[in-house]
Regions:
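Hydrophobic secretory-pathway targeting helix
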Residues: 1-63
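Alpha-helical transmembrane segments and their helix-start/interface "positive-inside/aromatic belt" motifs
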Residues: 18-28, 232-245, 335-339
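Extracytoplasmic/periplasmic regions of membrane proteins
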Residues: 47-159
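Hydrophobic alpha-helical transmembrane segments
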Residues: 100-113, 134, 155-164, 183-193, ...
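Short, glycine/charged-enriched hinge/interface segments at domain edges or termini
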Residues: 147-183
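Transmembrane alpha-helical segments that form the functional core of multipass membrane systems
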Residues: 166-171, 178-271, 279-292
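Alpha-helical transmembrane anchor segments
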Residues: 221-223, 378, 382-390
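Generic detector of multi-pass transmembrane helix bundles and their immediately adjacent loops
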Residues: 249, 253-383
């Protein structure tokens, strides 16, 4: 099976006739104007939103996190009164049944830098297992009496994630050179659009479909031209991607309506429903489907555009070009399908494991509402929220 990934639409002459070229450029210009108008109309009002309860401190403001590292870890009696307090030395050991695990954390930032605090865990499955020297993040809260308390928040991952991102960037640039660097810039642009436009607009209660379509179009215009250069070949690929995006949005809406998906089977969506009442959960689910389809659509349309233009440059009738392009496309679609399905199944392995021990039939597994709306990104977000709310 030949899975073509010749993503180089900017190279070579463009075998488009003058009329076809004018149509492509004209349509992209018109769509671009509509996207700009849509962004202006849907631009978020930056309304102040109350911080969700799990992320509030006792005064209702955002929880502050500080850096720390583990000094010692030991088995201890549960319910030690020193847990969470600011300490200047190691607390005395309490005698009794040592059913918990306590870790002394040195505070490395904030107003109590240089002091210590004590965190406690039950030691059960899923609880952190802190080793001496490990760097962590701890929350700092001040209660109404002015007393400062600390609690374990998460592992410190800044440097490890930065190192992985740096390795990824180096490999991309080393292999793809300037095109790889431009692709990385496209990723930055995509995240800026999501953070500056999409998320605030959804938070303001704007309709999910137009917001996600406008955001997706902005991302596509930026990343495709950045990564592949400005040419008629790239423009043809962009027009195909935008057309496919509309179809994907319609199919996503139809799937949600026909299968009666609500999104409320996932804890992150339930949290949004509880704390952001003006946000439509079904709309949020639909927006996730639309944004999630961008990568696949971009991959397929760019590859197909490259294949068609390469075939056209070598001559041949329109029929032979069409047949050859469809042959490449069928291989590409086939490999993309099982790639998506395997990624989908891999992200839902815990859910599949639970279904396997529950004695549920295959029909129940495939149609239960917690399964169709499952995706890697959404599962990760749900896991993150559950961990925070423990």
């Amino acid at each position: 099976m030949t899975h073509s990934h010749s993503h180089s639409p900017a190279s070579g002459p463009a075998p488009l006739g003058p009329i076809a070229a004018k149509i492509v450029v004209g349509l992209l210009a018109a769509i671009g104007v509509l996207v700009v108008i849509g962004a202006a109309l849907l631009w978020p009002a930056q309304q102040k939103v109350e911080i969700p309860l799990p992320y509030q401190n006792s005064s209702g403001s955002a929880v502050t996190t500080e850096a720390g590292h583990v000094v010692s870890t030991r088995a201890a009696v549960c319910g030690d009164q020193s847990v969470g307090k600011v300490l200047t030395s190691e607390p005395a050991r309490v005698q009794g049944d040592e059913g918990c695990v306590q870790s002394q954390i040195a505070i490395d930032s904030g107003p109590n830098q240089g002091a210590y605090t004590l965190v406690e865990f039950s030691g059960g499955p899923g609880q952190p297992n802190l080793a001496v020297g490990e760097h962590v993040r701890i929350t700092r809260q001040i209660d109404p009496t002015g007393t400062t308390t600390y609690a374990f928040y998460d592992y410190e991952r800044t440097w490890s994630l930065a190192a992985l991102a740096a390795v990824f960037a180096v490999v991309v640039v080393a292999v793809a050179r300037w095109r790889g660097l431009r692709a990385l810039l496209g990723i930055v642009v995509a995240f800026v659009v999501l953070v500056v436009f999409l998320l605030p607009a959804l938070r303001d209660g704007a309709s999910a479909v137009p917001v996600s379509l406008v955001a997706s179009a902005i991302i596509l215009y930026a990343v495709i031209y950045l990564a592949h250069g400005v040419s008629l070949r790239t423009s043809a690929a962009l027009l195909g991607t935008l057309t496919s995006l509309l179809l994907a949005a319609f199919l996503s809406w139809a799937a949600i309506e026909l299968t009666h998906l609500t999104g409320l089977s996932q804890e992150d969506n339930n949290a949004v429903a509880a704390y952001l009442g003006n946000v439509s959960i079904t709309g949020l689910l639909l927006a996730g489907f639309i944004i999630g389809s961008l990568g696949v659509l971009n991959d397929v349309t760019i590859t197909q555009a490259s294949a068609v233009f390469e075939l056209a440059e070598h001559g041949g009738s329109r029929r032979s070009i069409f047949v050859g392009a469809m042959r490449v496309g069928s291989d590409h679609i086939a490999s993309t399908v099982y790639t998506l399905v395997l990624a989908y199944a891999g992200s839902a392995l815990p859910l599949l494991l639970l279904f396997s021990v529950a004695g549920r039939g295959l029909g129940d597994v495939l149609t239960v509402r917690t399964w169709p709306s499952r995706s890697p990104a959404r599962r990760s977000a749900a896991s993150h929220w559950r961990y925070r709310c423990r």
